[in-house]
Each structure stands twice: as structure tokens, then as C-alpha cells.
Curated annotation (Swiss-Prot):
This is Oxysterol-binding protein homolog C23H4.01c. PANTHER family: OXYSTEROL-BINDING PROTEIN HOMOLOG 3 (PTHR10972:SF203), OXYSTEROL-BINDING PROTEIN-RELATED (PTHR10972). Residues 460-470 have a biased composition (Polar residues). It comes from Schizosaccharomyces pombe (strain 972 / ATCC 24843). Belongs to the OSBP family.
Length: 945
């Protein structure tokens, strides 16, 4: 072997005479960074050589000081009579490169080492070139490598890190052996800018836009190919590289996996059978008009053994369902125990399926190959036609769950009710087998949703199961708002907060009712019976002062400090999300158990928790105002500091739903209304005597495989009473560890606050975390004055706790200008809420008999959810969704456009802004909300529930 050094900005040529019908082979290893090589053929009709002094040598060096070194070197090769015979690849220092190529026509060949892309660094290469006769089949001009090509390289468009900067051309290399993809600024650059192992990444593609998305969980690359052929080439290469990495990591015997999987399915079948009997017993009691005995066979349930001791435990539960209190108590206890076991089993199955799927994710049998020319059709749940059916009850001779496993599923997910333990069960059944497949005509209170799965026992989809075994056929009155009763059952199942990942109208659950539910009292009657939520009666109109902030000022009112404990863990909907990679997931349906008792309108109001920052900004010196406004902007993210807040999502409002918030202790009033359904747009307005705040958020969320990107389009505008105006756009946030691990939300990159009056600008930078560092909380705020100079003062701290006013010249802290407020007691059991958020859904003396019928506090399904009454929350949620679909369908038939009641768009109308956020919505000045509230005239409000 031979070792040479290729200087920077140079080409080194190794000459070799090769006989006809030979095989030219090479082995080379670069000791530092990388080198590129090509093979050229010397034309016979050209007598000139590169350099007269090198005419009798076997090696030549080309060196040029021109700016475009590579192009100059290629021109010299061409001028010397050399034509490209074989285009090589970039060889990295980590792996040696070897290969061979068939030479049909003999002659003089040049093996060219290319280091023109390196400006200062020479490269040392050890290589071996051999030419041997080849007696195999003649394949002219074809490469006969002993192994597949190790490096795939080319140019792709990569979305820039900063928001709104579009795509940039980058040079990518895919190492097929290592299973890694990396990129450089351009083809001639030797500085690697990023590298992702494919073994830990989730890859999604879109044929229509030629997109390739690579999500490692830490960073996300949004790539785009120039042509369809280029897109297919990269998809093929990525699929092969990922398959090779996946197959190399299979260390578990296949038979052991299959045996373990079958054992889990068997355990689940027997557990499911007992739960079905509980449901059968409950429905039988309700259905039977006359009292009779109902016998239930003995059920034997074998629980999974300890992983270390490998011991099996048998539990025999004998249930005799008779019309007596003792049977009901026993059945309830058994159901609660089985529910807890099902939850643990679900977590184990989910992890097992996740590991198993990683090995089969790229196989043709489990999904469509990436290199095929296909189109993915993503449906909006609002457009998905829900199937409504009247279903009968379980018969006494219903088939057992063991028999049900043999039949294929002919319908989608089922939402069932079972005991008062509120057990969340996940079940995906579209192409998979189901334990309830043969009962689709005998099940009560069942709702369908769509989900595609190819695994025979796919991880369970989001379903809420909650009812009481001995409950009567009549719905109980709505629980009081102030109820703070805590349940002893405390379980956690990770989920994620998508801000608005599911619209009530965007659910594909069917609005199915049993015969008993039809006879239940209406929702409005239940609300009246509860004597807590009531629609006010019209009062005598009163004149309104346009300059007042009615109903402020107001005497101080008492507010609660917490909400009822949320005892039912949220289900995991990874099986749904993973089928929507790269798409907006705001339309994905989810059961009510996955919601926290908070609405998106109320979440918007949480931005004003630290409104005192704006009060101080109005009163302080002009050069300090922007620091307080920046602190206010940072405080908007602090409500997500407890990680429990990231495992559930908020309720999405109905079209026309409103929410008011009057804080007499903070001297401001707030109003929000959902003004558009598609795209989802919320109009918000708040005002006090010191400032006016306006925001029209347009939330968009996308799932990238391991993380969820949360974007809130629409500018925030702030006008202080002193005349200064500010505006800013919220940065993107990422929900990390969606697939597995502890979930958390963190803001990404930076945001800018502009002083529209002076031209000053505050730049808020959120520090990025590393691969193993977890959530990053550090934040730095610097101010650039209108003259371009940076202010020596800045803000430093954490968006989860505090911000300090710091003088960088002196290196001391001037004062702490912002600190977070308190969380509720035991936040892990109360959705991780702040005390401010817990007070949102409460009806105080300020709101009593004053709210419009569209206010979120009067929404019955959310109220039931707050009080853990999932039995009534789920059907009410489905009913509200169905009614909204009917209203919108009727408006479309009559060609009627929805007009918001309290907000109007700005002068721009319906025109899209540059960022796609749409028009800015302003509060109406005439016949506005606060005048109607003062006069209690709500006749123009739509009926939503």
C-alpha cells in the first residue's frame, strides 16, 4: 500500500496502465476528514500531458490559486485529454473505501484524488490500486463492486432553523454502512453541520411535495428534493439504510418474541372477558323490566409473572351476579382491580409493540415502500362521516371474548362504559382482530372512530370506559362547580398537550345512544337541577358608558385554589399520531378522558396571568418599557413548566363559543371567541386602564414521529396608555418524547419584540438543549436600540421560574422583575395547573347570572370532565360535535357564511398575512359584548348546547 498527501485546493493524479477486459480495484483510507476521488480515461488522440516535467512519472499534482479551484482543476483535466470514466464518492475518515470497476478497453487511466474543496487542510491518504484480468461476463461500462455503494450523496433543500426563512441548498451524505445521514453547507465544504443516526430517527415522506422529514427526537430536518426522481433515489437509499440498521440490532430470538406476544394477547383476552361480563351484567339490569337472576360463569384470570423470579400467579374470581347489594359490591371491586391490571398490561404491550414495530417499520408487508409513487390522503375528522346507529344491549347468551378473537373486525373503535372506576382502555381495530368483533350488533353506547393498523394486537386506541355497576337509568344532576373531591386512584399514562389537537367538531365518534339514554333527561334540565349553571333572564336595559371598563371596578370576590383531582390517567394515542406524521394533527379525534378541564379559549386567557408586567411597563421610563414587555412575553410559556401539563390536551371550542375573564384584583377584562373553524382562529381582546392587548391566534400542530411542533400564528399587539405600542410573534414550541419517555414542552429558537414607536427591538433567545440534557429552560433577553447599538442591560433567567434585570457592564443583578406564580397543591394530580388556570372554569359572583349562553363555563361536557364524571362527559361531547356538524351542513346548503358575534376582521379582511396568520380581529365597538352583558341581552347568541 502507498501513502500520499494531497495539499489543500489540489488534485493528485495516480496514473495506471490497464489491459483490456480487466478489473480495476481500489482500497483507500483517509486519515483526516474526507477526500473525493474519480477515475478518468486518457484519450488516445491527445498527445499533450498535464506537465512536461511529469511526462515520465506516474503521478501528477494540479494546484491552482483561483477562487473556483475545483472547476479550474476539472478544466485542466479535460484540456489534457482526460474524460470522466467513473464518478467516485466522498470517502470519510471513519470508514475505509473499497470497490472495483470493469475496464473493457485498455489504456492509460488516471485515479484522481480531489481535495480542492479544502481551503487550508491537507489530506493524507493510504491506498492500493490493482488491475487484474477479468474472465467473467462482459458488462461494458458497468461497476462490479464487491459490496453495495457505501456513500450516497447529493444536494437537497433543507428548511432553515429560523422561522420564516424558507429552504436552503445543502449537501447531504448517507452512509449506508453506519446508517447515518449528515450534511454540509455545499459540496466543497469539509465542515459537517449535522449528523443523525437513522436507527433512532423517524422518517416520513410526501410524494406530492417531494418532502423527506427526519426526526431524531432532538432535532428535526425538513428536506425537499429538486425532482421526483431525486426524491425516489433518496427514499430508496434511506429505506435500505434504515432496514440494514434495524436488522443488525435484532438480538431477541423471533420465536421468543412470538411466544411472548401470544402470551400477552391471551392474558388480555381473559382480562377483557371479565370486563365484558361486568358490562353484560350492568346492561342486563337496566334492560330487564322484571326482576330475575342472571348467572355469570366462573372466570379464571392468570396474571403476568414477575420478570425476575419468573413466577406465575393465579387468581380465581367467582362472580355470581344476583339482584343483591353484595353482588354489586363484589363486581365493582373485581372490575376496579382488573382495570388497574389492564392499565399496567397496556403499558407493557405498548412498549412491546413499539420495539417490535421498529424492526418491521420499513418492511413492505407493514407499510407502503417509500420508493413507490403513492399519494397519502389525510382526512379531516370533521369531514369523516360518522356512523350513527341504534344498538341493542348485550344478550344473556352473548359470546365470550375468547371466541371473539377469531373473527375480524368489521367496524372501528368502540367506546364502552364499565363500572365507576373510570378505566382508560386503548384499542385500535381496523384491520386487526378485536375481542368485541362479534358484538357489533349487541353493544350499547358504542361510538366508532377510524384507525388503521396492521398488527394483530396493535396497541390499544384511546377509549374512555366509565360507568357505575349499580347506577340507575336516570342521569344524576350536574355536580357543583366548587366540588373538589379527590379520588384515591392515582395513575399516570403519558399523553401530550397539543393545544388544539382535537376539535369537538373534528371527532369521528358516532353519536350513538341506547334506548335508556333516549329516555334520560336533557342536558339543560340536568344543569337546572344542579342549580349552579343557569342562563340569566333579560333585565331592564341600562345605558353603557363607552369609556368605562364595565363591570370594573368591582369588590373583591373569592376564588378557588384548585380543581377536583384528575384521577383517570390519559390514554396514549401514539397509534393514531404515527399515521399522521408531517401533517396538521388538529383534526385527530380523541376521547374526553384525554382532555384536561380547560378550554383553548381559557388557555389563551392564561397569557394574561402576569398582566402586572404591562402595568409596570406603562409607568416606567421609556428605555425600560421594552424589558417589561419582554418579561411579559416570556411569562406566556410559564404555565407549561410542570410536565404533567404536557400529557393532556385542552378542550377545543365550538364555533361561536366565547369566554370572558374579569379580574377585579388585576383590573382588566378579557374576551375570546372562536371566529373560524377551518383554519382554527381564536379572536382575543383584553383591556385595562393602563394597556390594551390583542391577539388572534391560529394554532397549527404537526407530528414528526418523536416530537410535536406547536406553532401559534398571529401577532400579539400591545398598546400602553402612555402611547407606546409593541408587537411580537410567538415562537414555535416542541413537545418532546411523544413516543416514549417523559414528555415536556419547550420553546424553540428565539422571538423578537418590536417597539413600533421608537424602533427598538428586544431579542429573546431560548437556549437549545442537547440530546441528553432534557428540557432547556435558560433564556436571555437583549435589546437593540433603533440606532443599532445593543443596550448594556439585559434580562437573564429561566422561563420556568424568574427573570433578572442585569447590567452586563458591571456584571451585577439590578433587580428581579418577574417571578412565577404558585401551582396548585399536588399539581401531579391536578394536570399540573397553576392557581390562575384552576380559577378559569369557576363561576364567581362576578359571572353569576351574567354570562351569555355561549360561555365556556356553561359547557356541560367540560363541566362533567372537571368533576370526573366521564360517563356523562363522553356522550355529551359527541352530541355537541354532531350538532355542530349539522349546523355547518345546513349553512353550506343555504350558502350562509358564518359571522362572529363579537369580533370583526381588520381592514385587511380575509386576506392572508405574509406569515399566513390571516386578518387581525378587533372587538366590535357598537352592540359589543360588554354592552350586552351590562343589559343582559343575549338574544343574538347561537345555541351551542
Amino acid at each position: 500500500m502507498e501513502t500520499v498527501e494531497i495539499r489543500s485546493k489540489s488534485l493528485l493524479i495516480q496514473w495506471l496502465t490497464v489491459e483490456s477486459n480487466s478489473l480495476l480495484s481500489w482500497q483507500l483510507h483517509v486519515k483526516r476528514k474526507s477526500i473525493k476521488f474519480d477515475i478518468y480515461h486518457k484519450k488516445n488522440d491527445t498527445s499533450s500531458l498535464l506537465d512536461g516535467s511529469n511526462k515520465n512519472t506516474d503521478r501528477s499534482i494540479l494546484h491552482t490559486k483561483r477562487q473556483h479551484t475545483h472547476e479550474a482543476g476539472i478544466k485542466k483535466l479535460s484540456a489534457a485529454g482526460l474524460e470522466l470514466f467513473y464518478q467516485g464518492e466522498r470517502c470519510m475518515s471513519e470508514k475505509p473505501s473499497e470497490g472495483s470497476v470493469y475496464i473493457e478497453n485498455g489504456g492509460l487511466y488516471a485515479f484522481v484524488f480531489d481535495n480542492t474543496f479544502s481551503k487550508t487542510k491537507p489530506k493524507t491518504v493510504t491506498f492500493l490500486l490493482t488491475a487484474q484480468p477479468y474472465n467473467g461476463p462482459r458488462i461494458p461500462n458497468a461497476s462490479v463492486h464487491g459490496s453495495p455503494k457505501q456513500i450516497i450523496s447529493g444536494t437537497l433543500l433543507k428548511k432553515r432553523r429560523k422561522k420564516g426563512q424558507g429552504y436552503a441548498r445543502r449537501y447531504f451524505t448517507l452512509n449506508m454502512v453506519e446508517g447515518t445521514i449528515s450534511y454540509y453547507a455545499n459540496e466543497n465544504s469539509s465542515v459537517m453541520r449535522g449528523k443523525i443516526p437513522l436507527s433512532i430517527a423517524v422518517i416520513s415522506v410526501a410524494a406530492e411535495t417531494h418532502e423527506i422529514n427526519v426526526d431524531s427526537g432532538v432535532e428535526l430536518w425538513n428536506l425537499r428534493a429538486h425532482t421526483h426522481q431525486d426524491w425516489l433515489r433518496w427514499c430508496n437509499a434511506l429505506e435500505k439504510a434504515k432496514n440494514s440498521q434495524t436488522s443488525s440490532k435484532l438480538v431477541v430470538d423471533e420465536r421468543t418474541q412470538e411466544s411472548s406476544s401470544n402470551q400477552l394477547v391471551s392474558i388480555y383476552s381473559r382480562l377483557r372477558e371479565c370486563l365484558d361480563i361486568a358490562q353484560l351484567y350492568r346492561t342486563s339490569r337496566i334492560k330487564s323490566a322484571s326482576s330475575h337472576n342472571f348467572s355469570v360463569p366462573e372466570i379464571r384470570i392468570q396474571l403476568p409473572g414477575d420478570a425476575k423470579e419468573n413466577k406465575e400467579t393465579r387468581t380465581s374470581v367467582e362472580i355470581t351476579a344476583a339482584e343483591n347489594a353484595q353482588a354489586a359490591v363484589t363486581l365493582r371491586k373485581v372490575t376496579r382491580q382488573l382495570g388497574s391490571l389492564l392499565h399496567e398490561l397496556e403499558c407493557f404491550i405498548q412498549h412491546h409493540e413499539y420495539t417490535k414495530e421498529r424492526t418491521a417499520q420499513s418492511s413492505p408487508s407493514s407499510r407502503m415502500s417509500m420508493d413507490s409513487n403513492f399519494e397519502q390522503h389525510w382526512y379531516d375528522a370533521e369531514d369523516y362521516e360518522s356512523t350513527t346507529s341504534q344498538l341493542n344491549h348485550y344478550s344473556e347468551s352473548g359470546a365470550h371474548a375468547a371466541d371473539a378473537t377469531k373473527s375480524s373486525v368489521a367496524h372501528n373503535e368502540k367506546v364502552e362504559d364499565i363500572s365507576d372506576s373510570d378505566i382508560p382502555i386503548m384499542k385500535t381495530s381496523s384491520n386487526s382482530t378485536s375481542l368485541d368483533a362479534d358484538r357489533d350488533s349487541d353493544t350499547s353506547s358504542i361510538s366508532d372512530t377510524s384507525s388503521n393498523s396492521s398488527a394483530p394486537h396493535e396497541q390499544l386506541n384511546a377509549t374512555s370506559l366509565a360507568s357505575t355497576v349499580d347506577e340507575s337509568s336516570r342521569s344524576p344532576p350536574l355536580p357543583e362547580v366548587e366540588s373538589n373531591k379527590e379520588n384515591d386512584i392515582k395513575r399516570k399514562q403519558p399523553f401530550h398537550d397539543l393545544m388544539d389537537s382535537s376539535s369537538p367538531d373534528d371527532s369521528s365518534f358516532a353519536n350513538a345512544k341506547s334506548d335508556e339514554e333516549v329516555q334520560k333527561p336533557s342536558v339543560s334540565k340536568n344543569i337546572a337541577d344542579g342549580a349552579v349553571i343557569s342562563i340569566p333572564k333579560p333585565l331592564t336595559p341600562k345605558p353603557s358608558d363607552s369609556n368605562s371598563l364595565y363591570p370594573l371596578p368591582h369588590s373583591k370576590v373569592g376564588r378557588r385554589k384548585n380543581i377536583p383531582a384528575i384521577t383517570v390517567p390519559p390514554p396514549s394515542i401514539l397509534s393514531i399520531l404515527r399515521k399522521n406524521i408531517g401533517k396538521d394533527i388538529s383534526s385527530i379525534p380523541a376521547p374526553v378522558v384525554s382532555n384536561e378541564p380547560c378550554n383553548l379559549l381559557q388557555r389563551c386567557a392564561e397569557d394574561l396571568e402576569y398582566s402586572n408586567m404591562l402595568d409596570k411597563a406603562n409607568e416606567c421610563d421609556d428605555d425600560i418599557k421594552i424589558f417589561y414587555v419582554a418579561a411579559f412575553a416570556v411569562s406566556n410559556f410559564s404555565n407549561m413548566r410542570h410536565k404533567e401539563r404536557s400529557v393532556r390536551k385542552v378542550f377545543s371550542p365550538l364555533l361561536g363559543e366565547t369566554f370572558e375573564l374579569v379580574r377585579e384584583d388585576r383590573n382588566y377584562r378579557f374576551l375570546a371567541e372562536k371566529v373560524c373553524h377551518r383554519p382554527l382562529i381564536i379572536a382575543c381582546h383584553a383591556e385595562s386602564r393602563n394597556w390594551i392587548w390583542n391577539h388572534s391566534p391560529k394554532p397549527i400542530q404537526k407530528f414528526w414521529g418523536k416530537s410535536v411542533e406547536l406553532n401559534t400564528l398571529g401577532p400579539v399587539t400591545i398598546k400602553l396608555a402612555c402611547g407606546t405600542e409593541f408587537s411580537f410573534m410567538k415562537p414555535a414550541c416542541f413537545l418532546k418524547n411523544v413516543a416514549i419517555g417523559e414528555k415536556y414542552v419547550e420553546p424553540y429558537d428565539h422571538m423578537e419584540i418590536v417597539d413600533e414607536t421608537t424602533g427598538d427591538k428586544a431579542v429573546i433567545r431560548f437556549k437549545s438543549g442537547g440530546m441528553f440534557s432534557g428540557r432547556s429552560e435558560d433564556v436571555l433577553v437583549t435589546v437593540i436600540r433603533s440606532n443599532g447599538e445593543e443596550d448594556p442591560k439585559c434580562l437573564q433567567g429561566k422561563w420556568t421560574s424568574h427573570l433578572d434585570f442585569v447590567n452586563t457592564d458591571e456584571g451585577n443583578v439590578i433587580e428581579r422583575i418577574w417571578e412565577v406564580g404558585p401551582l396548585v397543591d399536588k399539581p401531579e394530580d391536578h394536570c399540573g395547573m397553576t392557581v390562575f388556570a384552576a380559577q378559569m372554569n369557576e363561576i364567581t359572583d362576578l359571572e353569576k347570572d351574567k354570562l351569555p349562553p355561549t360561555d365556556t363555563r356553561l359547557r356541560p361536557d367540560q363541566r362533567y370532565r372537571e368533576n370526573n364524571d366521564l360517563d356523562h362527559a363522553e356522550p355529551l361531547k359527541l352530541e355537541l360535535e354532531q350538532k355542530q356538524r349539522e349546523r355547518r351542513k345546513e349553512m353550506e346548503e343555504k350558502d350562509i357564511k358564518w359571522e362572529p358575534r363579537w369580533f370583526v376582521p381588520s381592514v385587511a379582511g380575509d386576506d392572508e398575512d405574509e406569515d399566513g396568520s390571516g386578518p387581525i380581529w378587533q372587538l366590535k365597538k357598537e352592540n359589543n359584548y360588554w354592552e350586552s352583558r351590562e343589559n343582559s341581552t343575549w338574544s343574538s347568541c347561537p345555541k351551542l348546547w
